[in-house]
Structure formats: structure tokens, C-alpha cells
Amino acid sequence: RSSHRNEVMKITPNLIDNLEYADIVRGSREDFEVVYKKDNPDTVYKAEIAFYCKDFIYTNGAENIVLRGKNDFKKEYPVVQTHTVSTIGAGDNFNAGFIFGLIKNHITRQMISNGLTEAQWDDLMHYATKFSANCCEDIYNYISKDFGAQMNLTLNK
């Protein structure tokens, strides 16, 4: 976050540790501008991320989501269009939707290590963007109870 701009040097060793442990790195344009002073997803990926982790998700507000993965996999995903009330919590709910997709599709760490298929990535991004969009539709910064109930019903299908 921009409020931590002055602490980048201090946190860099921990950041590198986290990158080394990561199976997937996800961050926003703002995050990478603060940490690396770079705002191009391919530049961030090639110069800062790919050495440590091959699966990379770059979010950029209402702009397309950029995915870079193993075996030179590249794809962009549109953001779900919605009536946006607040974007606070959008990234956290994107992550929650992504994790929901991992659980729903029984995607394991080994599967991630071997490289996900395009269909698997598509499904993960589907849930990530749905959760994020739902969160943005009100002032509470998390998904609605109705949306959560709908998603819960899909787990057993």
C-alpha cells in the first residue's frame, strides 16, 4: 500500500522470503508501483516475480486481470461489470473467490506445481472476479449473505 512506501527497503527481505515460498503471487498495480516502481504487468513478472514464482496474477482496478503462468501461459480476464459502491475489500474478496475456486475444483498444491490447465485458470478467475464484484456492490466490503449462500450451494455440485 502507498502508506508503506517509506518502508519498502525494510520489508524487502521478508518480501523475498514470501516470494520464495509462494505457489501463486497476486498483487495489484498499486502494490507493484509501491514495491518495485513498475506498473506494467509483464515487466513486473519478468523482472521481479518469475525467478521466484511462475504463477502470477496482476489486478488493476476495472482493467483486465493479467495472468502469467508456467509453460509461458498468458491470458487476460475481464473484470465483472457491476454498479460499484466501494472498492475497499475488492482484493481480499478476489483472493477469497480464488481460494473458493481451488476448493470447489479440488485443486491441490501438486496440481499447481505441475501447471494448471486453461480451463482450471478460467474457473478460478471466474470465482475470483465474481466474489470481488459482489463485494464492490455495497459499503460493507465483503460478499453479501445471499451471494455466500448461492456459492455454498455450488460447492456440492
Please place each PLM-identified region on the residue numbering.
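Conserved beta-alpha-beta core of the PfkB/ribokinase-like small-molecule kinase fold
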Residues: 1-43, 63-64
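Conserved phosphate-binding/catalytic region of the ribokinase-like
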Residues: 11, 37-157
